[in-house]
Amino acid sequence: MEKRKVTIRHFLEAKGSRKLAMVTAYDYPTARLVDEAGVDGILVGDSLGMVVLGYENTLRVTLRDMVAHVAAVARARPRALVVADMPFMTYETGPRDALRAAAKLVRAGAEAVKPEGGVEIVDVVEKLTKTGVPVMGHIGLNPQRVLTLGGFRMVGKDEEARRKVLEDAKALQEAGAFALVVEFVPASLAKEVTEAVKIPTICIGAGPHCDGQILVLHDIIGLSEKPPSFAKRYADVASIIREAVAKYVAEVREGKFPTPEHYRP
């Protein structure tokens, strides 16, 4: 029997009872594979700028980029919930611009969107959720603010920063977010956030106390050149690709490929 489609309700009901597993995907074949592996959610992340397009950060990723990759993932018709990152400067300018951007992502196949920020984007989250667009929040480290942060640094190490993260979490919940990504904060703070809100929290680099975890696919399978310290590599796909292509190159140069079973006389 076919498994049921994962929905927002699935995420909400998992709070405190079942760990949620999410991963990124950016195209049709990887979306199909990670879905077959049983993930609860697929994030079409603006991290594609770094792991697919070769940028130093996520800031150069455009809405057009995101729409194309969301559409590719959606064509796999995954059981998992498809969440799309809202790229830099598509929502910071206000609710109206955010709604236009979210509409394009939803039309492409996204089932929820994820802007970064806390109290400062409450008006955006309220507008989106009241208009029928599910929102997953993102607190702690916001990669789109890498320039002002001076790099990808842990957030919430001092008391003032901890209070800000907690304030952001509660504000986003009140604004209508159905879940929160909590990125690169101390595990004790992630635990405090998880206990303070009624919606599920999804950790990345924030310890084991959230309601779920998310990692970038390329970090998991060994395709990232410089994975973050909090990522775990479960396979070395890079070596498999290099070995397979090297064998192909050698056989072509030695005249061993193609053989009769690969062509018609």
Curated annotation (Swiss-Prot):
Active-site annotation: E183
Cofactor binding note: Binds 1 Mg(2+) ion per subunit.
Main location (coarse class): cytoplasm
GO molecular function, one term: magnesium ion binding
Pfam families hit by this protein: Pantoate_transf (PF02548)
Cofactor(s), by name: Mg(2+)
Compartment annotation: Cytoplasm
Function: Catalyzes the reversible reaction in which hydroxymethyl group from 5,10-methylenetetrahydrofolate is transferred onto alpha-ketoisovalerate to form ketopantoate.
Protein name: 3-methyl-2-oxobutanoate hydroxymethyltransferase
Gene from which this protein is expressed: panB
